[in-house]
């Protein structure tokens, strides 16, 4: 047995007790935290072992078409992580120079619902390549060169209009694998323009949900992750993007368990970052709508008002209202105008609404 297979077995072994505990009183107290742990483990397992889930050959030279079709035959919530893993596996296999992966040939035939996952997976692969080649003590010039190559790699492989979806994951890779270079990489991204700086910190925020100190969802892990999202970036706008990215990750991973999202909502409300939470939640659910256009099962709980004491008023204000508005008044315009990748940057609801219905000829 290889080390990789042994690690997979260890993940599955941990999932057993987590599932059992989560089934006892789902969504309640510590049992909710076991649900959350299982969700994290499952998302990671499906991403990291997508090739095993689909029984792909070990030979890295394969087309994306067949694996994508196999992944789409899976249950939708599982498929999104497998698709991301497929693209990551494809982007890291071998030393070949990839070009036009999703913009020509087979890539043009892949359905819209796969674009979020596939661009994210490719971006993770390209970021890992670029940052992994830096060595142990890179100077600012070499970091800037690596970032420039990474951005170029993303742009020559993206479907038109989807650059942001593959560039944002460099923040995930930087924060999880190279935390000591977090600010130098951020400076290099900023040197290429404010839009890339925003994407970077959104990715950093997503990473904070998965770093070791926050991975096990016990002992106020949401509060710790939020504190990092507020303290690690150096500017207010970067903090908004980091909190939005963190909320995105919490929402997407725990989509079947709204109670987990409700806990994150409460923490964000207490810290006074409601707009960033709303953007992260709405953006994740807009992405989900793109990935699962026919879904009602998972989305429905986020559209249902709560009644009674406790968090009901907060839920209706921070979740039901914005999600209903986004579903009805924002998503159709983003899809029609090919701007779905804009959900990777913090924007207010008004800015999203405006962006959704701008002419394609206007700059973003």
Language-model segment annotations:
Residues 1-364:
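Mature, well-folded catalytic/scaffold domains that follow N-terminal targeting or propeptide regions
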């Amino acid at each position: 047995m290889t080390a990789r297979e042994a690690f997979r077995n260890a993940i599955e072994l941990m999932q057993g007790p987590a599932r059992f505990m989560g089934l006892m009183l789902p969504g309640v107290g510590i049992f909710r935290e076991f649900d959350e742990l299982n969700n994290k483990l499952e998302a990671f397992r499906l991403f990291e072992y997508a090739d095993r889930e689909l029984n792909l050959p070990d030979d890295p030279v394969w087309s994306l078409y067949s694996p994508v079709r196999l992944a789409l035959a899976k249950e939708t919530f599982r498929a999104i992580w497998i698709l991301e893993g497929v693209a990551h596996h494809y982007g890291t296999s071998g030393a070949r120079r990839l070009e036009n992966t999703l913009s020509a040939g087979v890539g043009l035939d892949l359905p819209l619902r796969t674009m979020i996952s596939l661009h994210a997976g490719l971006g993770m692969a390209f970021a890992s390549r670029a940052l992994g080649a830096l060595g142990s003590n890179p100077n600012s010039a070499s970091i800037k060169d690596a970032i420039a190559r990474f951005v170029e790699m993303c742009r020559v492989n993206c479907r038109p209009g989807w650059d942001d979806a593959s560039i944002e994951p460099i923040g995930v890779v930087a924060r999880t694998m190279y935390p000591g270079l977090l600010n130098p990489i951020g400076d290099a991204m900023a040197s290429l323009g404010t839009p890339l700086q925003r994407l970077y910190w959104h990715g950093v925020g997503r990473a904070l949900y998965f770093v070791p100190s926050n991975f096990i969802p016990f002992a106020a892990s949401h509060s710790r992750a939020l504190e990092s999202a507020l303290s690690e970036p150096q500017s207010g706008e970067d903090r908004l993007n980091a909190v939005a990215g963190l909320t995105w990750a919490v929402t997407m991973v725990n989509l079947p368990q709204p109670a987990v999202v409700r806990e994150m909502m409460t923490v964000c409300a207490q810290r006074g970052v409601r707009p960033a939470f709303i953007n992260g939640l709405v953006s994740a659910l807009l992405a989900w709508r793109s990935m699962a256009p026919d879904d009602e099962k998972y989305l429905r709980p986020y559209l249902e008002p709560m009644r009674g004491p406790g968090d009901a008023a907060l839920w209706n204000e921070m979740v039901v209202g914005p999600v209903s508005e986004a579903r009805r008044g924002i998503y159709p315009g983003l899809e029609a105008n090919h701007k779905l990748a804009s959900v990777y940057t913090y924007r207010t609801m008004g800015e999203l609404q405006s962006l959704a219905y701008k002419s394609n000829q206007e700059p973003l």
